[in-house]
Amino acid sequence: MIQWRSIQHGDEAAIVAVFIASVHQVARRDYPPEQLAAWAPETGIDPVAWCAPLFQDDTLVAVSAGRIVGFANMTLAGYLDRVYVAPTHQGQGIASHLVSVLERHARAHGVHRITVAASHTALAFFKAQGYQVVWANIVERDGVRIGNTIMAKVI
C-alpha cells in the first residue's frame, strides 16, 4: 500500500536514488547514454544540495514498505518541477496521484495554470493528465543538449 506525505529532512538520499534510477532505467528508451549521464549523474550528486529546492516548494513523496518510491514538487508559481517514480513502481498510478494532489494544492493557493518541462518519456503521461504542448524545448546540462517539451494545463 502506498502512503503519501510531504518531504522530510532525511529523505534526500532516497529521493536522489529514485531520480537516478528513474532517469537511467526508464528514460533510456528515449535518450542516449550521454544525455542520461548529464541529466542524472550516477555519482557526485550531493543529495542535501540537490533536494534543497524541494523544501521551498510543495513536495510530496510516495512511500511503500517504508521506502520512498516516488516524489513530485511544484513551485508556488505553478511550475511542476520534478515528477519521478522508481522503475519498480511505474504504472501503478503513483505519478498521477502525486500530480493530482499538487494541482489541487496549487488551485487552493490561487494558481490557475500549471506548466511543466516534460521529458520525451513523460510526454504521453502529461497529455493523459490534460496538459497541452506549448513548445519544444532544449536544456543544456554539462554541455549536453537535452530535448523536452514545455506543456501547460489550466486548472
For the regions a language model picked out, list residue spans one by one.
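Conserved catalytic-core motifs of GNAT/GCN5-like acyltransferases
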Residues: T115-A117, Q132-I150
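Conserved active-site tyrosine of GNAT-family acetyltransferases
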Residues: F126-K127, Y131
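Conserved G/P- and acidic residue-centered "switch" motifs that form tight phosphate/ATP-binding loops
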Residues: G93-A95
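Exposed loop/turn and edge beta-strand positions of beta-sandwich/beta-sheet ligand-binding modules
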Residues: Q56, Y79, H112, R145-G147
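Acetyl-CoA-dependent GNAT
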Residues: S6-H9, A17-Q90, V99-V101, H105, ...
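Conserved GNAT acetyl-CoA-binding A-motif
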Residues: A106-S119
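Extreme N-terminal starter segment of soluble prokaryotic enzymes
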Residues: M1-Q3
